[in-house]
Amino acid sequence: MANILKTIIENDKGEIRRLEKMADKVFKYEDQMAALTDDQLKAKTVEFKERYQNGESLDSLLYEAFAVVREGAKRVLGLFPYKVQVMGGIVLHHGDVPEMRTGEGKTLTATMPVYLNALSGKGVHVVTVNEYLSERDATEMGELYSWLGLSVGINLATKSPMEKKEAYECDITYSTNSEIGFDYLRDNMVVRAENMVQRPLNYALVDEVDSILIDEARTPLIVSGANAVETSQLYHMADHYVKSLNKDDYIIDVQSKTIGLSDSGIDRAESYFKLENLYDIENVALTHFIDNALRANYIMLLDIDYVVSEEQEILIVDQFTGRTMEGRRYSDGLHQAIEAKEGVPIQDETKTSASITYQNLFRMYKKLSGMTGTGKTEEEEFREIYNIRVIPIPTNRPVQRIDHSDLLYASIESKFKAVVEDVKARYQKGQPVLVGTVAVETSDYISKKLVAAGVPHEVLNAKNHYREAQIIMNAGQRGAVTIATNMAGRGTDIKLGEGVRELGGLCVIGTERHESRRIDNQLRGRSGRQGDPGESQFYLSLEDDLMKRFGSERLKGIFERLNMSEEAIESRMLTRQVEAAQKRVEGNNYDTRKQVLQYDDVMREQREIIYTQRYDVITADRDLAPEIQSMIKRTLERVVDGHARAKQDEKLEAILNFAKYNLLPEDSITMEDLSGLSDKAIKEELFQRALKVYDSQVSKLRDEEAVKEFQKVLILRVVDNKWTDHIDALDQLRNAVGLRGYAQNNPVVEYQAEGFRMFNDMIGSIEFDVTRLMMKAQIHEQERPQAERHISTTATRNIAAHQASMPEDLDLSQIGRNELCPCGSGKKFKNCHGKRQ
């Protein structure tokens, strides 16, 4: 282990030496750039662009381009990047993460690689965690970029598609991670290419990269459509039942945060809902409602996991930032169960139309880099999942902050009593204090205690994050006391007021350890910026979540034996033990994220295939007849091959029914037309007849443009419907394969195999539906509407297909379970009308 650590440290030192040499080359251009007039300096941008177009690489332009930005920043912003900032910029250009401490000027560091990569004309995305930071950085740094001749855009959620498109067309685009993700998904749902807003993803520079790529890695971005099924009554019934339970009626696993009914709970459910057997297959839906009601009532906590807004809405609280996540909802019915629990209006369940995780969104960029003050603890994850290295950059001035050993108390009450006493003492001498909490509930509790102690203070949490920047900016003033949840105010520097340095600088107090060391380090890093003095102190209790999860029982005995109910234990060994517990949790979390990625990679591969083919259809300025005719041919082959083992007369009858109800006019084909033909000849005969019907359908359309429009909307409509159903099916499969792990099967392998089979079935189903709609649509000659922005075009109105129905005289007992259902759904018989047999 010691050798591994030594190797890592040596590698880092070697990297720093290499970066210092590269930074020196940038500095050699300093005098040359200083001698240029403003116009000459601005002209460098045009020169660099021409050199790039003529074959020079961005790497070869780096030294000169960085020197131009340094000089430009000095003239426009009054800031001159230090050597360590130039080093950080080089790391960013190479697609890695420079670990730079709080206050080291990450925003200015980013200007150099952003400028250099924008010269390619392919677009640079600067990604921030919230819109306030996007607007702030775009306004401040945009002044420099514009002066140097580059265009800057800001992409906000409130902007129209046209405004978004303009923002993405700029050389540099500032946006939040979620908005880039949603724009990507929406672009892959439009019917016309001109309605897409993004260009191909080129280079992303992610601010607070650990927050987005690690903490939110598992968060799927979901575009949903409402599901019409009215289920609010079931949510209320399940909630009423769950609230009637005693503690013995359910079992909670604290470590994994799971819950289930005990035998007595099952008996009560069967009595309450008047059932013979709760776990009968007919009650699968009901058990889902009960499971969600259990989680909502006994796992999800008000003011910790969520808050109830004044508008009677349930808002999720981000566990890492302490902010409410506007517009986000728990999926799979959990959000509705919480709404029932809190007695607020239940919103309709939604159906997923498109989804992607941040892991797969950001892996689609040609080059990805990011900035953070605390990335080294997650280096393995950055390297394995994103192929990014984390390189620690030295501080411009030595860090002077004093990090005290943790103080451990027996109870939460005695811990908070000590916190309030410490805050009061520091307030009285004028030293500013920042108190970091894990939950909204904790910050409210401490606030009440400080009010009682007569200590004026500000509270920054999910309930008032709109004042965030203002509160944080004042947190370093003499006598300021600020309570903040976790990461609130990240990205805004706390600058020390007059006379504060002499009092020891800003003191950061942590009220408990987070399960991630990185989050604790981020809290500590709010103090001691740019060589300022500062202090940090964590207060823990045996009743904290992290301590309960990892061995507080042994320590509890020590407190009881020594009769130390109000006193604290302080030791470096204790701090190391806590950090060891955190490492275990981090390891578990990493494993979970890695497994999520393995599952999501199945979806990613399938999504890329669908989106690529969809893009090809949208951008096609050609007749799509060859594609549609190929679909008709493959559908015919599937139907004929699907009945290959049936008796001859049964086979012919099934094929004839398919042809009548899905392919040809009903009275245009009889059994005699197919009798005596081989399977190959049947396929050819039906295909030739189908081509005539196709030509007849197309001839009803007014002109070539109308044909193209009809073909596009026909294909896109079918693909989007089937893809939406497929996403839901994959979600259900993922839940189901987890159970197969108990049968010694690898759930991921099972999911990959089953997901691949389902995808192939979906492709078959898409081709079946396109065939049926193309051949059976009632096409009317109509004028094309002028309003281009409406997706409801002539073509969508023209598709008024006959709903293929099951012939009344058909003997269903003769149809094989794995054959295609003759109703024309495109599903296998066992999954369609065969379910009723």
From Swiss-Prot:
A Gene Ontology term for the protein's cellular component: cell envelope Sec protein transport complex
GO function terms (MF aspect): ATP binding; metal ion binding; protein-exporting ATPase activity
Superkingdom, taxonomy of origin: Bacteria
Sites where the protein binds Zn(2+): 821, 823, 832-833
Entry EC number(s): 7.4.2.8
Binding site for ATP: 85, 103-107, 493
Cofactors demanded by this protein: Zn(2+)
Subcellular location: Cell membrane; Cytoplasm
GO biological process entries: intracellular protein transmembrane transport; protein import; protein targeting; protein transport by the Sec complex
Cofactor mode of binding and number, as noted: May bind 1 zinc ion per subunit.
Pfam families from the UniProt entry: P-loop_SecA (PF21090), SEC-C (PF02810), SecA_DEAD (PF07517), SecA_PP_bind (PF01043), SecA_SW (PF07516)
Transmembrane segments: none
Classification via InterPro entries: Helicase_ATP-bd, Helicase_C-like, P-loop_NTPase, SEC_C_motif, SecA, SecA_CS, SecA_DEAD, SecA_motor_DEAD
Assigned keywords, A-Z: ATP-binding, Cell membrane, Cytoplasm, Membrane, Metal-binding, Nucleotide-binding, Protein transport, Translocase, Translocation, Transport, Zinc
Catalysis performed (reactions): ATP + H2O + cellular proteinSide 1 = ADP + phosphate + cellular proteinSide 2
Membrane topology type: Peripheral membrane protein
Entry's family note: Belongs to the SecA family.
Subunit and partners: Monomer and homodimer. Part of the essential Sec protein translocation apparatus which comprises SecA, SecYEG and auxiliary proteins SecDF. Other proteins may also be involved.
Record-given protein name: Protein translocase subunit SecA
Annotated gene: secA
